[in-house]
Amino acid sequence: MKVRPSVKTMCEHCKIIRRKGRVMVICSANPKHKQRQGK
C-alpha cells in the first residue's frame, strides 16, 4: 500500500473509498494501485 498526500485513481478499476476517516483507493484488477491518504 502506498501512503500519499494526494490519492488518485490509476486505472478504471480503482475506487476511492473512505474507511475510518481515511481516504483510500482500492483496485480489483491491480493490487499495486492500493493507496491511502495521510501520514
Curated annotation (Swiss-Prot):
What's the domain of life for this entry?
A: Bacteria
A Pfam family found in this protein is Ribosomal_L36
Q: Which GO terms describe its cellular component?
A: cytoplasm; ribonucleoprotein complex; ribosome
Family membership, please give it.
Belongs to the bacterial ribosomal protein bL36 family.
NCBIfam families attached to this UniProt entry: rpmJ_bact (TIGR01022)
Q: HAMAP family from the xrefs?
A: Ribosomal_bL36
Protein name, as recorded:
Large ribosomal subunit protein bL36
